[in-house]
UniProtKB/Swiss-Prot annotation:
Part of the CMR ribonucleoprotein complex, consisting of crRNA plus Cmr1/Cmr2/Cmr3/Cmr4/Cmr5/Cmr6 at 1:1 and possibly 3 Cmr7 dimers. A Cmr2/Cmr3/Cmr7 subcomplex without crRNA can also be isolated. It does not cleave target RNA. The gene is cmr5. This is CRISPR system CMR subunit Cmr5. InterPro entries: AF1862-like_dom_sf (IPR023101), CRISPR-assoc_prot_Cmr5 (IPR010160). CDD domains: Cmr5_III-B (cd09654). The keyword Cytoplasm applies. It is found in: Cytoplasm. It comes from the Archaea. It comes from Saccharolobus solfataricus (strain ATCC 35092 / DSM 1617 / JCM 11322 / P2) (Sulfolobus solfataricus). GO terms for cellular component: cytoplasm.
Amino acid sequence: MTEVQEEKDYKLAIEAFNLVYNALDKKAREKFRSRARDMVEEIYTSGFIPTLFYIISKAGLENNNDKLTALLNSPSSKSIDLGSSDEASYMAYLFVILYYLSERNIINKEFLINKLKNNRLELIDKLYELSPIISARIKRYLMAIKRLAEALIEVR
């Protein structure tokens, strides 16, 4: 990976973290911090797709899909309230992953949002197809998210 790509990953991590930080209340931020610490390791232990399935199952998309798509569509200045539940922290971590994939043009944002709303199975199939590329490229970004969460989110 080139130095320019690394810088882009760090910049994206800061942008995504800022959006997530502003979308969660204090309790959910603490939970997100745990997700950021655990999920990056889980992706490289269990694999991207099994971990993604787990995150999706915990994110409560059946009830909160509109919040996730709104966050993906929002400019960085607009705040979306994801809430304070465990689901919110998983949804925030799912957002972090999907944000990277769309902003780095690994997957088209319009396709991503459309499939989140209308056909998640087709989206999962596409992510499965791209998983070798995703796994190879996303680690530095997720590590940056982890470090930001550890540095900026206090736990009681």
